[in-house]
A protein has these predicted regions:
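C-terminal motif of bacterial Sec signal peptides marking the signal peptidase cleavage site
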Residues: 15-19
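Bacterial signal peptide processing site
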Residues: 21-24
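A short beta-turn/strand-edge loop motif at beta-sheet boundaries
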Residues: 47, 62-67
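Aromatic sugar-binding surface patches on proteins
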Residues: 90-97
């Protein structure tokens, strides 16, 4: 009887261990984004003043995205209520720009929305105004 109990326990432990172990391999994830945004400011580095935000927007293959609607919003991350938004104007070759008055230094969060023919992309970019 003891032998039967021992064997039953061994079988039970084996079943539990094989149920807990996963033989499935995780699905491959791709890190390629459908849109790449290169962000720069004029002047550079960003200073308290009228600041031009320049966005170079390309697809996953590095080709410029032209004719898109590019909405931008900026929020001061250290001060609630300090934000602005607007539509960037196309400059050609995938470049878009908007000018805003940054009267306060500190940390800012730029949210960029790119929309064009089935493409609806959002990216957040942190930057500092000196």
């Amino acid at each position: 009887m003891r032998k039967l109990t021992f064997i039953s326990m061994l079988v039970l432990i084996s079943v539990l261990l094989s149920a807990c172990g996963s033989a499935a391999t995780p699905a491959a994830t791709t890190s390629a984004k459908p849109v790449n945004i290169k962000f720069e400011t004029n002047p550079n580095p960003a200073m308290k003043s009228d600041l031009e935000l320049i966005l170079t927007i390309t697809d996953a293959n590095g080709q410029p995205i032209e004719g898109a609607t590019v909405d931008v919003a900026v929020d001061h991350t250290d001060m609630t209520g300090m934000g602005m938004s607007g539509l960037a104007t196309e400059q050609g070759d995938g470049r878009y720009a908007i000018t805003a008055d940054f009267s306060d230094s500190g940390n800012w969060l730029l949210t960029v929305y790119v929309r064009k023919e089935g493409l609806d992309y959002k990216e957040e970019i942190e930057f500092t105004v000196q």
